[in-house]
């Protein structure tokens, strides 16, 4: 894989990457097993930071429109606020997938995107003067194919992933005869310790069964059921207003990741991730609206959605604008923004 110079529309227009932003771009590879699309990685390093503790990855979905959005992902102020609070970098890939091309060729990290991602961390570490970037933990957010990618990275690299938010896309754990182009993953025991949130719109098969994206819920349900049955730290949050768009899910995603990173990131860069404590967790019915302390949950805990703390994953909260959120969402977001402005 080599650094690329030429760009093809619509991937030829994007913001400049001057410090604290840095960028690398790799050409498509013709080697078996390597990434067949060009890819552009942009990273933001919080100004003045001496030692990074992690990297937050904002991963787009499939198709030209979504892939193109990755060109500006590292410039998002909400995500920068989260990154700054935890001494993390913010990384946004942009896979230059043609509109009709097979998304699996990048959203399955085994098809070369996983290796390209790890390579970019080393190259960006050198550019930014932060050698620790190549080894710090990852916090992953992904939409659609990006959720498939983020979930795949949890299964392939559980010891590197602090937490993962999967919006409208998840990897398969069992082969699906109806989706022969998608390869199943295996579920290692170590992945059960990684906090994961499955987040989707209700129109993606939860209450609306004839939507174009109605197959999203069965896939999420299958992943959730298998992981939770084995004691995995996985939850479900359903947005009652959206379909395959992202809606207002960031208002919960950022706060959920904040909770996970506050617990899991090592105090000193280079040390191992901390395990999530068993005490303090909350449980909820997967498509329900309220969560309760785990010890007060009266249903089957192995079928219940898991939350790291008292964050209430109500379906109403995920969909409602920030000014109407009940506690603790608005104060948490406000604190993050205050951190970013200092």
Model-derived segments and their meaning:
Residues 4-55, 85-86, 138-159, 181, ...:
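A domain-start/cap signature at the N-terminus of enzymes
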Residues 46, 58-62, 93-96, 141-145, ...:
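Active-site-proximal beta-strand/loop segments in catalytic clefts of secreted hydrolases
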Residues 49-101, 173-174, 206-208:
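Short substrate-entry loop that stabilizes the transition state in hydrolases
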Residues 51-55, 85-91, 134-137, 158-163, ...:
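Loop/turn elements at helix/coil->beta-strand transitions in domains of secreted/extracellular proteins
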Residues 67-72, 101-106, 151-153, 175-179, ...:
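Short, solvent-exposed loop/turn and secondary-structure capping segments
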Residues 230-232, 239-341:
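Alpha/beta-hydrolase-fold serine-hydrolase catalytic core, especially in secreted/extracellular enzymes
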């Amino acid at each position: 894989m080599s650094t690329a110079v030429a760009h093809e529309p619509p991937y030829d227009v994007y913001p400049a990457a001057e410090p604290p932003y840095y960028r690398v771009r790799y050409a498509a590879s013709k080697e078996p097993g390597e990434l067949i699309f060009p890819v552009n990685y942009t990273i933001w390093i919080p100004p003045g930071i001496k030692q990074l503790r992690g990297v937050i990855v904002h991963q787009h979905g499939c198709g030209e429109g979504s892939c193109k959005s990755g060109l500006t992902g590292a410039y998002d102020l909400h995500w920068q606020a989260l990154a700054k609070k935890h001494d993390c970098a913010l990384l946004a890939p942009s896979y230059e997938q043609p509109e009709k091309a097979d998304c699996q060729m990048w959203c399955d990290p085994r098809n070369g995107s996983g290796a390209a991602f790890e390579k970019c961390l080393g190259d960006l570490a050198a550019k930014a003067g932060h050698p620790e970037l190549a080894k710090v933990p990852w916090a992953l957010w992904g939409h659609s194919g990006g959720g498939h990618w983020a979930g795949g990275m949890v299964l392939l690299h559980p010891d590197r992933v602090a937490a993962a938010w999967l919006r409208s896309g998840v990897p398969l754990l069992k082969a699906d005869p109806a989706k022969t182009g998608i390869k199943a993953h295996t579920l290692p025991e170590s992945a059960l310790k990684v906090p994961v949130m499955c987040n989707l719109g209700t129109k993606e098969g939860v209450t609306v069964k004839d939507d174009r994206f109605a197959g999203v819920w069965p896939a999420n349900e299958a992943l959730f059921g298998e992981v939770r049955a084995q004691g995995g730290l996985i939850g479900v949050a359903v947005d009652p207003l959206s379909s395959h768009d992202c809606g207002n899910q960031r208002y919960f995603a950022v706060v959920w990741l904040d909770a996970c990173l506050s617990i899991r990131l090592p105090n000193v860069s280079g040390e191992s991730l901390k395990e999530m404590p068993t005490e303090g967790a909350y449980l909820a019915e997967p498509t329900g609206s309220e969560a309760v302390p785990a010890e007060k949950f009266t249903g089957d805990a192995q079928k219940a959605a898991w939350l790291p703390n008292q964050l209430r994953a109500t379906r109403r909260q995920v969909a409602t604008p920030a000014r109407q959120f009940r506690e603790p969402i608005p104060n948490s977001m406000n604190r993050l923004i205050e951190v970013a402005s200092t």
